[in-house]
Amino acid sequence: MTQADQAVISLRPGGGGGIGGPRAGRLFPFGASTGSLDFLRPRGGASSGFAAKLGDLRFEPLERVRYTRDQLVELHEIIDIPENILKLKQDIDIELHGEDEPWINNDSSVQTQSYNRYAETDNRDWRSRIEQPVQTPAIGGEEKSWDKFREAKESYISSGKQDQFNNQDKLSSQFSAKAQVGPAPALVKAEVPWSIQRGNLSNKERVLKTVKGILNKLTPEKFDLLKGQLIEAGITTADILKDVISLIFEKAVLEPTFCPMYAQLCFDLNEKLPSFPSEEPGGKEITFKRVLLNNCQEAFEGADNLRSEVNKLTGLDQEMERRDKERLVKLRTLGNIRLVGELLKQKMVPEKIVHHIVQELLGSESNRCPAEENVEAICQFFNTIGKQLDENPKSRRFNDVYFNRLKDLTTNSQLASRLRFMARDVLDLRSNQWVPRREEMKAKKISEIHREAENNLGLRPGSTASIRTGRTGTGGGGPLSPGAFSMNQPGIVGMLPGMPGARKMPGMPGLGSDDWEVPHSRSKPRADPVRNLTPSLANKPSPNNSRLLPQGSAALISGKTSALVGSGGPLSHGLVVTPSQTTGPPKSLIPAPSVDPIVEQPAAAPKPSSTELQKKTISLLKEYFHILLLHEAQQCIEELKSPDYYPEVVKEAINLALDKGTNSIDPLLRLLEHLYNKNVFKATDLETGCLLYSSLLDELAIDLPKAPVHFGEVIGRLVLSHCLSIEVVEDTLKKIEDSFFRAAVFEAMMKIMKANPSGQAILGSHVAKIDACSKLLSSE
């Protein structure tokens, strides 16, 4: 037996070195019939120590030692296991997996798992994964020992306390099974696999998809373009026509603001789309108009059924669902009414249908109050088509009957106050020749929005379009010329007059501290243009097109006169800069012969119009109610420089405060008292302002029911602060025509006065005035 064979068959873990030294090799001469096994027997008192050490060696995670079957059989034949070893093995088994004791020691369990993992033979090739024969030990006694360890391991795994080992074993068994089976099986595909690509759409689905996309993009700006695409979408059958009309109807009723646009679309489609034969023999042909009106009728008649279904949702858990459905039913009802009214304007709905709708909403019994939903719908209906009905003499007679019924509803106590005021608004609208007090919300084109912005901001026509597109007008609408400038260049936008950050160009009106435009005084001495020109401006070539320059700068470039620069006289010192001088290389400027400057007579600044003053007043008042700075508001009002307009300021302040609500009453009174104490406002300004507001109270109280009460509180507190005289109360009440509003103002004022001792003293000293006010209330 060679030395290499001795190293291979060594029972010591690691195969060489350690306990026994070279002695172990001499005691196991495989090939000899007998041998000495004294090292396995206990020697003296070293029995327990040796056993412990042997147990430790069995569980140490050292390198595995492989033995052939023949070697193990030879060992089985020549080795006789001593009783001490068997007893030690039995003690270890009882300690590790006793009959009654649970596995509590985690360390021992980990050691057992480690032992089992390293005790099993692992002959798998993990790289090539080729099946190899597994060597199995053939020792009978040892097989029982390993079986016990394996059973203990399986029972511990089943308890679920070491899932990580379970996962590792499962993974190992999975790899083993795959290695034994051979190649991996093919993937099983689903019968209907998921795919990014959509299935083939039918012609109807394709058309409806196209129509939905067109309706989602429909705006007044793109109306003509998208209308043509909708006509060419492929509406070739009656079923497609009905579904397209349903899509348009749903969009219209859920977007009431765009109902005029959808009504115009329906009118055009009715003219362009073909009609189809009836599906029933002898029936009428299917047209766009007939299908659309059927949808409107079904929605109108089915509203009551929808409300009855909503009323059945009475459970506490159905509260949110009930509210959502109520809102949806209300939106669809009002949208349907609005659409029918707009279709009447397009002559697609006959007037007899309109009268039928009105009679259904008002009810047949004149002494019975209609439902709140019907009252709101009829008010919306008359806001839309009232003017068209009044233009027809025959329909006007019916309108008189309808509006008499509405007038009765304004005094019906069974109706909510919101709806009573809504009916009163419709009556006022008719009495005002159908001219609304406020502009109606409707869809507008971008050009219309820009035009309104230019009018409100005082900009030149086309300024907003130039800012949006980043180019200025060149006359031909083409690209910018080499001499033109782009709006995207830094600092160019700031040169536009009236824009934020605008530069002060020659002759351009200045801006005050509050960003209001203030004309320059003509008596202000003008500086030398040569000194004012910076080197970059004097040497830089300028564009030849003077239209591209800001207002007021044309005179500086071309020498022409401008109304903004002066009264048409030449520039001081006779300096004239021509385009040829600016486009060529820089030359020394030679001034013209000096001429004595013309002394201009100081001219008074033009007086601002009432419209400008009103805009400024509303702006400063809104700013005050936002920041609540008295001194800032005082400065802004003084900068108006129009004491005659102060009563209007008082009226606008009261109007804005009462429109905002009760939280703005205290800031309003602080402002008026502050301006009165600072001698900015006089007593006559406050009195006149209150009279102006009281003359508007009859109309304002329709939208602001609490306005009379709050106005009475304002008057009472102004009287208490001695800013207002008690004599003005009678004149204020005379300006109010409605007796109900008049009584509300007087009662609120008296309540404030009586709650204060000084107010009681004022009332006691002006008994005659109070009696006169009381007579105004009793005379009605």
UniProtKB/Swiss-Prot annotation:
SUPFAM superfamilies: ARM repeat. Residues 457-482, 506-549 are annotated as: Disordered. One of its GO terms (cellular component) is eukaryotic translation initiation factor 4F complex. Residues 533-548 have a biased composition (Polar residues). One of its GO terms (molecular function) is mRNA binding. Residues 612-734 form the MI domain. Residues 517-529 have a biased composition (Basic and acidic residues). Keywords: Initiation factor, Protein biosynthesis, Translation regulation. InterPro entries: ARM-type_fold, Initiation_fac_eIF4g_MI, MIF4G-like_typ-3. Residues 208-432 form the MIF4G domain. Gene3D superfamilies: 1.25.40.180. GO terms for biological process: regulation of translation; translational initiation. The keyword Protein biosynthesis applies. EIF4F is a multi-subunit complex, the composition of which varies with external and internal environmental conditions. It is composed of at least EIF4A, EIF4E and EIF4G. In higher plants two isoforms of EIF4F have been identified, named isoform EIF4F and isoform EIF(iso)4F. Isoform EIF4F has subunits p220 and p26, whereas isoform EIF(iso)4F has subunits p82 and p28. Belongs to the eukaryotic initiation factor 4G family. Plays a role in the accumulation of a sobemovirus (RYMV) during viral infection. This is Eukaryotic translation initiation factor isoform 4G-2. It comes from Oryza sativa subsp. japonica.
